[in-house]
């Protein structure tokens, strides 16, 4: 394989796992980060150990000019962007009545405008090659809602709508656009929960376990592959049955 992928927010967590899984599948991977250069470089070394090419690139996805330069650099180094994974995201939680306008704007800018920027800037290159796969990370809360996360939920619901619209616009050129919606995934946050709270959360999950980063990474890798070339405009829920 001589294909390349760009994963945003890939210096840790789910983004890191996605980048490593795509490398395992044979993709050259560009590791985008916002501020964690050392962590991003560590991921690059893990990827290179799998026998593919990789480099770290800093860009704030909320800024269109930075995204444009990022795409240009990835194409310069790899020759193309065959797969774009929009994973970068932030949270600034607060109750709706207490949420500051800046908290709303910051999350919207990164989580929703950032996805728009990356899709818009990568599309010309994918149109020229008449192929490509775009996978957007959304969330179970984009479908269910969640108290204290009005800004985050709005972005994740917006990503689902943006995914469907982009899929309709780009399908005729051989470009697929899908979303992956994680449920509760093991993280530092879930590890810090009390056993009682963990049990309460697990009661809502028919499969009776929290998800792993690899559950998400494997789903993204499938959607990026030729095995999923007849799938577009879909949101794949990976949540152990918590939302059906």
Swiss-Prot record:
InterPro entries: 3oxo_ACP_reduc, NAD(P)-bd_dom_sf, Sc_DH/Rdtase_CS, SDR, SDR_fam. The active site is at residue 152. Keywords: Fatty acid biosynthesis, Fatty acid metabolism, Lipid biosynthesis, Lipid metabolism, NADP, Oxidoreductase. Pathway: Lipid metabolism; fatty acid biosynthesis. Substrate binds at residue 139. Coiled coil: none annotated. Its EC number is 1.1.1.100. GO terms for molecular function: 3-oxoacyl-[acyl-carrier-protein] reductase (NADPH) activity; NAD binding; NADP binding. It catalyses: a (3R)-hydroxyacyl-[ACP] + NADP(+) = a 3-oxoacyl-[ACP] + NADPH + H(+). One of its GO terms (biological process) is fatty acid elongation. It is an enzyme of class 1 (oxidoreductase). It comes from the Bacteria. NADP(+) binds at residues 9-12, 60-61, 87, 152-156, 185. Catalyzes the NADPH-dependent reduction of beta-ketoacyl-ACP substrates to beta-hydroxyacyl-ACP products, the first reductive step in the elongation cycle of fatty acid biosynthesis. PANTHER family: 3-OXOACYL-(ACYL-CARRIER-PROTEIN) REDUCTASE, 3-OXOACYL-[ACYL-CARRIER-PROTEIN] REDUCTASE FABG. Belongs to the short-chain dehydrogenases/reductases (SDR) family. Homotetramer. This is 3-oxoacyl-[acyl-carrier-protein] reductase FabG. It comes from Staphylococcus epidermidis (strain ATCC 35984 / DSM 28319 / BCRC 17069 / CCUG 31568 / BM 3577 / RP62A).
């Amino acid at each position: 394989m001589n294909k390349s992928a760009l994963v945003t927010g890939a210096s840790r967590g789910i983004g890191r796992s996605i980048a490593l899984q795509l490398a395992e599948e044979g993709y050259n991977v560009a590791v985008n980060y916002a501020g964690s250069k050392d962590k991003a470089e560590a991921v690059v070394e893990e990827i290179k150990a799998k026998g593919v090419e990789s480099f770290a690139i800093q860009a704030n996805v909320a800024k269109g000019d930075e995204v444009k330069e990022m795409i240009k650099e990835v194409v310069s180094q790899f020759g193309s962007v065959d797969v774009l994974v929009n994973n970068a995201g932030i949270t600034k939680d607060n109750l709706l009545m207490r949420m500051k306008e800046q908290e709303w704007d910051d999350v919207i800018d990164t989580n929703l405008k950032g996805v728009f920027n990356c899709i818009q800037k990568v599309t010309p290159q994918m149109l020229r090659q008449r192929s490509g796969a775009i996978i957007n990370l959304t969330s179970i809360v984009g479908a269910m809602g969640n108290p204290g996360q009005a800004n985050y939920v709005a972005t994740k619901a917006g990503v689902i709508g943006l995914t469907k619209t982009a899929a309709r616009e780009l399908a005729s050129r051989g470009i697929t656009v899908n979303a992956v919606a994680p449920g509760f995934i093991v993280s530092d946050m879930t590890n810090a929960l009390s056993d009682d709270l963990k049990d309460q959360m697990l009661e809502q999950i028919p499969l009776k376990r929290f998800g792993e980063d690899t559950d998400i990474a494997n789903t993204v890798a499938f959607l990026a592959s030729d095995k999923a070339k007849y799938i577009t405009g879909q949101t794949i829920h990976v949540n152990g049955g918590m939302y059906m």
